[in-house]
């Protein structure tokens, strides 16, 4: 019986480690996009004269629309070819994913307790994951 318990715990631990090792498709897409961005940076900069509004705020979650407007500007001003096509395709897929996630923001009406639980979690995220500027 004791041996069975040890084997069960060992199997559970192995399953947990395997689950951590598996990346989500979005994480892989973002990693690939970062690599493409680094690879094609010089091509994207071009002659350096293009001016794109860039958010000053460091909390990128608050500036998603501005970031994607900048991406559209960059895409429209960059010579399209095989070199950057995959980059802009990936950025479009990431935007689509974010748009789908934003649709989850409009939720149902909940009792005050559930809202306060959500608010507490929200403030915890701000406190731990956002860069608070002075």
Curated annotation (Swiss-Prot):
Which PANTHER family does the protein's record reference?
Answer: INTERLEUKIN-5
**Which cell locations does it reside in?**
Secreted
Indicate what this protein is called per its UniProt record: Interleukin-5
- What does the subunit section of this Swiss-Prot or TrEMBL entry state? Homodimer; disulfide-linked. Interacts with IL5RA. Interacts with CSF2RB.
Could you list this entry's UniProt keywords, alphabetically sorted.
Cytokine, Disulfide bond, Glycoprotein, Growth factor, Secreted, Signal
Q: Which domain of life is it from?
A: Eukaryota
Give the family from UniProt: Belongs to the IL-5 family.
The gene name on file is: IL5
Q: Which residues cross the membrane?
A: none
Entry keyword annotation includes Disulfide bond: yes
One Gene Ontology term from the biological process aspect of the record = immune response
| Function of the molecule | Homodimeric cytokine expressed predominantly by T-lymphocytes and NK cells that plays an important role in the survival, differentiation, and chemotaxis of eosinophils. Also acts on activated and resting B-cells to induce immunoglobulin production, growth, and differentiation. Mechanistically, exerts its biological effects through a receptor composed of IL5RA subunit and the cytokine receptor common subunit beta/CSF2RB.
- GO MF annotations, alphabetized: cytokine activity; growth factor activity; interleukin-5 receptor binding
Pfam families documented for this protein: IL5
Where this protein primarily resides, as one coarse class? secreted
Instruction: Check the UniProt entry and state the signal peptide residues, or none.
Output: 1-19
